[in-house]
Amino acid sequence: MEKILSDGFAALGITPDAEAVGRLKAYYEYLEERNKVMNLTAISGLEDVARLHFLDCAALLTVCDFADKKVIDVGTGAGFPGLVLKIVQPEIDITLLDSLNKRIDFLGEMSEKLELERICCVHARAEEIPEERRAAYDIAVSRAVARLGTLCELCLPYLRVGGRFIAMKGPDCADEVAEAENAMHLL
């Protein structure tokens, strides 16, 4: 895993410290163990998790400056991308939001095992925005949750004025972007 991560991070221009790489390895091991009984992710195996989860999520760090930002990951699932961002850039203040309590329990356990600070795991539906979280974040991220128009409606209310929303989408998203333009302008 270290070689895959090392090569991948170098290609992205990211230089995580040894502690971050160690935490990603521990994350992988615990994810694989718990995935056997919880169905956290369809992607498994060292190489696939390293490339398709860890490096894919870490690539967000090349999009904008996350340092010392307050970030929410809406529909985090097994912690993608939010937990990976937190591990690679620990100074992020992150909230992991998911509607399934079993995932939030897993993320709480994982955060504790990795001794992560400034991380909050919240069990809630994205559309049920608690008042204290409305307009409270600098950055909202989401990966593999819903179509872009729906994501705009779910994620944008969490952002402060001037905040950034980053939706991780596949290469064939042009139709989704065109479809979501109205929602983006209205919100």
Please describe what each predicted stretch is.
Residues M1-D68, I72, K102-I119:
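Class I SAM-dependent transferase core
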Residues E91-T95, S99-L187:
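S-adenosylmethionine
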Residues G75:
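Conserved glycine-centered beta->alpha loop in an early N-terminal alpha/beta scaffold
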